[in-house]
């Protein structure tokens, strides 16, 4: 049976918050009977998380839109005592009546994407705009967040689990916290920009930026990546796990080697003068 999935490209998000505004416009002051009560002001069912990596001038800033993951093995469903359920199309919904007064539901979500509505006395979260998807007159056939995005961050699709598994493998898609085994239906492209780190530097030879220097990155004595410096004499090895690495540089016969440690932070070696 076909189910709904979402793919979010971290590399394309510019933190414009159009997705958040679309979500708020759809749900704040709007009650959708059978789906959800109105959203409380200030809640972020589509939350844009931010992370800056590295140091100026070779730093970067990345943004990760984070809705409900609509997990196949959803802890909120398993522990919700009927207040949270999963539809056949994969969408996970909180029953707006059965969830009243059950603030403990928030503790069942390992992703922290559930909110407590003080005004309605009920737990709430992203519904994937199920009320729109169920409406045949809704021509876009996608949630408001995806429809509002002008940067093509979101890909929304309805397909079989088998077809989605093939897409995940072919495109190298990832999920948040895979170790939990919740099997989210929200996947990410370029998630490394938010979860992993890089090592970078600039190479100067006789005071000038050196283009074309050979740079090798090793871990445990084995080469894991290689690159050449660009016009500005810079190189960058990204998507690195925590650990110790060796950077070896050959700039027209001039050599350099250094050991760097990635420990939840990107490393900029500055300008290396050869």
UniProtKB/Swiss-Prot annotation:
- Binding positions ([4Fe-4S] cluster 1): 13, 16, 19, 149
Instruction: List positions binding [4Fe-4S] cluster 3.
Output: 68, 71, 76, 109
> From what superkingdom does this record's organism come?
Bacteria
Q: Which GO terms describe its molecular function?
A: 4 iron, 4 sulfur cluster binding; metal ion binding; pyrogallol hydroxytransferase activity
User: What Pfam families does the record tag this protein with?
Assistant: Fer4_11
Cofactor(s) recorded for this entry are: [4Fe-4S] cluster
- The residues that hold [4Fe-4S] cluster 2 are 23, 126, 129, 145
Q: How is the cofactor bound?
A: Binds 3 [4Fe-4S] clusters.
What keywords are assigned to this protein? 4Fe-4S, Iron, Iron-sulfur, Metal-binding, Oxidoreductase
Role this protein plays: Isomerization of pyrogallol to phloroglucin.
Tell me the subunit arrangement. Answer: Heterodimer of a large and a small subunit.
What protein am I looking at? Pyrogallol hydroxytransferase small subunit
């Amino acid at each position: 049976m076909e189910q709904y999935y979402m793919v979010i490209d971290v590399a394309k998000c510019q933190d414009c918050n159009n997705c958040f505004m679309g979500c708020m416009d759809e749900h704040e002051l709007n009650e959708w009977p059978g789906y959800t009560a109105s959203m409380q002001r200030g809640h972020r069912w589509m939350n844009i998380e931010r992370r800056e990596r590295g140091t100026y001038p070779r730093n970067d800033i990345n943004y990760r839109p984070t809705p409900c993951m609509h997990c196949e093995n959803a802890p909120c469903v398993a522990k919700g005592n009927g207040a949270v359920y999963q539809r056949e199309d994969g969408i996970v919904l909180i029953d707006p009546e059965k969830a009243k007064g059950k603030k403990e539901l928030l503790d069942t979500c390992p992703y922290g994407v559930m909110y407590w509505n003080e005004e309605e006395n009920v737990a709430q979260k992203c519904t994937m705009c199920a009320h729109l998807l169920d409406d045949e007159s809704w021509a876009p056939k996608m949630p408001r967040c995806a429809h509002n995005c002008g940067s093509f961050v979101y890909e929304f699709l309805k397909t079989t689990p088998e077809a989605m598994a093939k897409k995940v493998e072919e495109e190298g898609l990832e999920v948040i916290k895979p170790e939990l085994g919740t099997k989210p239906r929200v996947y990410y492209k370029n998630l490394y920009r938010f979860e992993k780190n890089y090592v970078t530097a600039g190479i100067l030879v006789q005071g000038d930026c050196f283009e074309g220097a050979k740079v090798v990155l090793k871990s445990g004595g084995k080469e894991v990546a290689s690159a050449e410096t660009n016009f500005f004499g810079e190189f960058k090895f990204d998507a690195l796990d925590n650990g110790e690495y060796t950077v070896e540089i050959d700039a027209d016969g001039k050599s350099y080697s250094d050991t760097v440690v990635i420990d939840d932070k990107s490393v900029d070696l500055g300008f290396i003068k050869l």
